[in-house]
UniProtKB/Swiss-Prot annotation:
Descriptive protein name: Ras-related protein R-Ras
Top enzyme class: hydrolase
Organism: Rattus norvegicus
Subunit structure of this chain's protein: Interacts with PLCE1. Interacts (active GTP-bound form preferentially) with RGS14. Interacts with OSBPL3. Interacts with ZDHHC19.
The keyword Hydrolase is assigned to this record: yes
Bias (Gly residues) ranges: 7-20
Residues with Cysteine methyl ester modification: 215
E.C. no: 3.6.5.2
Length: 218
């Protein structure tokens, strides 16, 4: 479970207060990036996680940043979250924020087939920019409340995520379904990845014996 305080720089959107006196100091900082096609609900997911508020009107985002200090699995962390543009005209900005991210929430809408095709391209681009075969990424099928309009089967998305070593969540920003769970899992994935990337600690040198004979005082 997570808990904490939040703040944001979203234009015209509600802001949370800064960390309160009861919030533990963060022991770690993670830069998380929310990516996906236009209109899939990236901002709605982010604001619901940050401020427990559902944004119903679609307002195309250029770039908004938020901060949340929370505790995941008993460990306090500062999350710097970047909500990115999904519109094609802002595609040139993608590689810039991909270079800075420690982990990615890859979002499509279950009622939008094209957005699912888009996440495959974004996944490939992230690995290319990072020059890695693997990276901390969580796949989210948003708008699960629109089940009757579904265009992407759950089994299809699950198969795609499993083949690329990602955890998959079907979420709804409107219902606050699996919103916290997706972000918390991304934090866990980032932690695990960073632990694996750390170089092993050098073995401690054995203590040398001084070679002197023990003395007995009479």
């Amino acid at each position: 479970m997570s808990s904490g305080a939040a703040s944001g720089t979203g234009r015209g959107r509600p802001r949370g207060g800064g960390p309160g006196p009861r919030d533990p100091p963060p022991g770690e900082t993670h830069k998380l990036v929310v990516v996906g096609g236009g209109g899939v609900g990236k901002s709605a997911l982010t604001i619901q996680f940050i401020q427990s508020y559902f944004v119903s009107d679609y307002d195309p985002t250029i770039e908004d940043s938020y901060t949340k200090i929370c505790t995941v699995d008993g460990i306090p962390a500062r999350l710097d979250i970047l909500d990115t543009a999904g519109q094609e005209e802002f595609g040139a900005m993608r590689e810039q924020y991909m270079r800075a991210g420690n982990g990615f929430l890859l979002v499509f809408a279950i009622n939008d087939r094209q957005s699912f095709i888009e996440v495959s391209k974004l996944f490939t681009q992230i690995l290319r920019v990072k020059d890695r075969d693997d990276f901390p990424i969580v796949l989210v099928g948003n708008k699960a409340d629109l089940e009757t309009q579904r265009q992407v089967l759950r089994s299809e998305a699950s198969s795609f995520s499993a083949s690329h070593h990602m955890t998959y969540f079907e979420a709804s920003a409107k219902l606050r379904l699996n919103v916290d769970e997706a972000f918390e899992q991304l934090v866990r994935t980032v932690r695990k990845y960073q632990e694996q990337e750390l170089p092993p600690s050098p073995p401690s040198a054995p203590r040398k014996k001084d070679g002197r004979c023990p003395c007995v005082l009479l």
